[in-house]
């Protein structure tokens, strides 16, 4: 699977293939026990998606370790998690522009929005950041360990453009880019788009 010259796109391609191989993988980081009754199962089914933010972070940690265990990256750099920061995971090494992944854990049965993606198109000018969406469910639908159902990796640039093209519909709905806040400390910089509906 090695490629002769590691470039930004080459590293993203190799990492994307490894991420795709996570489909069917069960993360041994948390176990939700089997409900003791039918009522307990109904109640659990209503709240199980609340685990998505926690599992999203655990998946991010595990993804960095998983990618760093792959031989193809040896000698070129290491994957690092950025928290807080954008994107979630970056490849620190000899390759420019820096490759990265914004990792989204998506719970398909959620009763609220999961895997939100509001990042500005400004982040994707070099097309070096990709979005990795990992769809997960507990291995027994509402209980068990988190299991990755499937993985989708796409250019962050194409996702942001498609989102903005879909929603931006003046004068009814406007997608607004964030203000220039580079002079602020990192934790106060605005990076997300906003929607304005009239």
Predicted feature residues:
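Nucleic-acid endonuclease domains
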Residues: 1-85, 99, 105-198
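Structured, beta-strand-rich domain cores
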Residues: 86-90
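Active-site beta-strand-loop-beta-strand hairpin of nuclease catalytic cores
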Residues: 91-100
